[in-house]
Amino acid sequence: MNEFFRWILKHSTPWDIQPPLSDAELDELFGLMSDNEQLSKGAMGMEMADGYMTASLVGPDPLPIPWLLEAIFDQPTLPLPHDSERQQRLLQLLLRRHTDIQASTALSSDEVTPDNVFMPLMAQVPAEECITPYRLDEKHERIGRWELQDWGEGFRRAIAEDDAWEPLLSDPEVGGLVSPVVLYSMGHNPDCPDLQIDEDHELLPLLSVSVCAMRSWWRDYHRSLSAAAIPFERGAPKVGRNDPCPCDSGKKYKK
């Protein structure tokens, strides 16, 4: 059984009225999510979890939080089972970040300010591991690491696990919205080697805009489906069994 269901019912906190995470709280969350000795081997790091949560929130159908947490921690049981205090703190901070993403990606262009614009979480990459001038290894993968690599991979993984993304991906007018995600995940575009991640972060604003545009596209898509599903309304009242026949014969419609 997914233990996150029970935890959420027991700790039902109105996350949406909590203030956005502070820098200190984000640092604390990164630290808790980096506890490789206590967390499952397959658990996501904070950067990847942030990308995964973002894809869930701006995609076709947000994943229920218990299932989302199960995917992030790679287990249906609660993390840090032997330290209830740290467990509580970890889940609280993670769900507040989930709420922060939900709020910032839902803003219209008129509502966005420098203080509330959506920005992905990124972990610092050690200088010795940073990307080099564009080179691929024998597997045609980018050599080195770059900021938001894991974030892009988390977002990409969420898309790959959900076939419901197909309408957006197959739309030639908007399918390119995922291009920044692919670039951050792979470090380069396999179809265009000159398009690559570098150290000037020029793609970061584009990534932010694309993420919010995806949520807007799915909102409009669902509205169009709802409009198409509106049942037919009869233009005139239905003729009753004993009503006069519409042909003006004066006879009853049906005996």
Predicted regions located by residue number:
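Acidic/negatively charged segments and metal-coordination signatures
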Residues: 1-255
